[in-house]
Swiss-Prot record:
Keyword list, A-Z: ATP-binding, Carbohydrate metabolism, Glycogen biosynthesis, Glycogen metabolism, Nucleotide-binding, Nucleotidyltransferase, Transferase
Protein name per UniProt: Glucose-1-phosphate adenylyltransferase
CDD domains assigned: ADP_Glucose_PP (cd02508), LbH_G1P_AT_C (cd04651)
UniProt xrefs under PANTHER family: GLUCOSE-1-PHOSPHATE ADENYLYLTRANSFERASE, GLUCOSE-1-PHOSPHATE ADENYLYLTRANSFERASE-RELATED
Enzyme Commission (EC) number: 2.7.7.27
Pathways involved: Glycan biosynthesis; glycogen biosynthesis
Listed GO MF terms: ATP binding; glucose-1-phosphate adenylyltransferase activity
Subunit structure and binding partners: Homotetramer.
Name of the gene this protein is made from: glgC
């Protein structure tokens, strides 16, 4: 721990995540499953634990049952050594209101800071995908003399309305000159006009300065009690806010390719794209870095199994993540992420999709560019993600980019003849993962083209039984 400072970490995990609906209809945003085996909150807590910060409180509020359960099962620390990951719900400790914002959540939980008596408080969000050594940020914070430090990452200019925007002091690149939360627009960086400096939602504070700022905020009438919207501007106005450049952070086992990976997965499209990042031949974010592991609750399900189906077709998975307990029985999975205990039946196809725990895919069904939440049963011959109007008519969400989303336990009607024919015609779709590989790696284009030709030939053979597939 740098400079022998005592550090308390606070994870803000009370968000509703409206932009991730319907995945957040029954759970808090940080509890949304990710990458087959994890929950979103696992990335924040793993980064803190790997940074050797082992006194962690998680502030929860919205539909927190599954989040609380996950924390209690996955994050058991050695309390005899004074270490803990504690889930703390809104308790109305100050007045009769629940948490009114991220700053108010900490204000209502000031007893946690008083009890721990830290020198430094690290405050992090719970819904981003990245690796970060917070000890390096704390070290800069202490040496800089700032009272508050904000972690910053470069983002495309058209995303300025989604983040807190940081302007650095021209005479001191580690000092914040201005901070605006989610402006309609902002100038680009001098070094790269196509980008701006965005807040990552991760902060380091001198503990006494944070407590004082929270008391000031609590007395104000013109506040939303928000860390980014109110507390950070308070420190900026005092001339006491610093910035930490995320590109300086060095993670053991990382490469230049993945070292500065950071994704806000707060929308359906960004959540989907982050999954597709993982299954590419050379993923931008490497889940397999054992020197900075991402921890989670370990499944008790048996290993995945690939077996022949009833008609002797071979169960296969290509360019995919397949988790414990998955059984692919004569079906084909390509460019997809399958969580625990998914079942894929004979002659079915799962393409460019994300399937969460215990989804069952019936015989001959086709799923394309979809996110399907837990415990959904897809009947035989069903077509999902092939016809947006059909999907909407059945109550599924379809994004503007064409991602179809099914909520937990959502019922999928038995398909009619038109839908069965639609599924049958698309049993040999070429996955986006195959197309992307051809664009990303010219040296494998020939083999990728061969895969595409094989898919096309197989489709033609089914349409004309006398045709030959080579």
């Amino acid at each position: 721990m740098p400079l022998n400072k005592k550090v308390l970490a606070i994870v803000l995990a009370g968000g509703e995540g409206n932009r991730l609906m319907p995945l957040t209809a029954d759970r808090a945003k940080p509890a949304v499953p990710f990458a087959g085996s994890y929950r979103l909150i696992d990335f924040a807590i793993s980064n803190l634990v790997n940074s050797r910060y082992l006194q962690i409180v998680v502030l929860t509020q919205y539909k927190s049952h599954s989040l609380d359960r996950h924390i209690s099962e996955a994050w058991r620390m050695s309390t005899q050594l004074g270490n803990y990951v504690a889930s703390v719900p809104a308790q109305q400790r100050v007045g009769k209101s629940w948490f009114l914002g991220s700053a108010n959540a900490i204000y209502q939980s000031l007893n946690l800071i008083h009890d721990a008596n830290p020198d430094i408080v690290v405050v992090v969000g719970a819904d981003h995908v990245y690796r970060m050594d917070f000890a390096q940020m704390v070290e800069q914070h202490v040496h800089s003399g700032a009272k508050a430090t904000v972690a910053a990452v470069r983002q495309p200019l058209n995303m300025a309305d989604q983040f807190g925007v940081i302007e650095v002091d021209q005479n001191d690149p580690q000092k914040i000159a201005a901070f605006v939360e989610k402006p309609a627009s902002t100038p680009g960086l001098a070094a790269d006009p196509s980008q701006f400096l965005a807040s990552m939602g991760n902060y380091v504070f001198d503990a006494d300065a944070l407590v004082a700022a929270l008391h000031v905020d609590a007395e104000r009438l013109d506040t939303k009690h928000d860390m980014g919207g109110d507390i950070i501007p308070y420190f900026v106005n005092q001339g006491e806010a610093g910035v930490y450049d995320f590109t300086l952070n060095e993670i053991p086992g990382s490469t230049e390719r993945d070292r500065t990976y950071w994704r806000d997965v707060g929308t359906i499209d960004s959540f989907y794209d982050a999954h597709m990042d993982l299954i590419s031949p050379l993923p931008v974010f490497n889940l397999y870095n054992s020197e900075w592991p991402i921890y989670t609750r370990q499944s008790i399900s048996p290993p995945a199994k690939f077996v022949r189906g009833l008609n002797n077709t071979v169960g296969t998975a290509l360019d995919s993540i397949v988790s414990s307990g998955v059984v692919i029985s004569g079906g084909v999975v390509e460019g997809s992420v399958l969580s625990n205990d998914v079942y894929v039946a004979t002659s079915s196809r799962v393409i460019d999709s994300v399937l969460m725990d215990k989804v069952q895919v019936g015989e001959g069904a086709v799923i394309n560019r979809a996110i399907i939440d837990k415990n959904v049963k897809v009947p035989a011959g069903a077509a999902i993600g092939l016809d947006p109007e059909l999907d909407r008519a059945r109550g599924f969400k379809v994004t503007d980019s064409g991602i179809t989303v099914l909520s937990k336990y959502q019922e999928v009607p038995e398909p009619g003849e038109h839908e069965r024919q639609l599924a049958a015609k698309n049993l040999h779709l070429v996955p986006n993962a195959v197309k992307a590989a051809a664009d990303q790696y010219p040296e494998v284009r020939e083999s990728v083209d061969k895969v595409a030709r094989t898919h096309a030939a197989a489709a033609a053979a089914e349409a004309s039984p006398g045709a030959r597939v080579s």
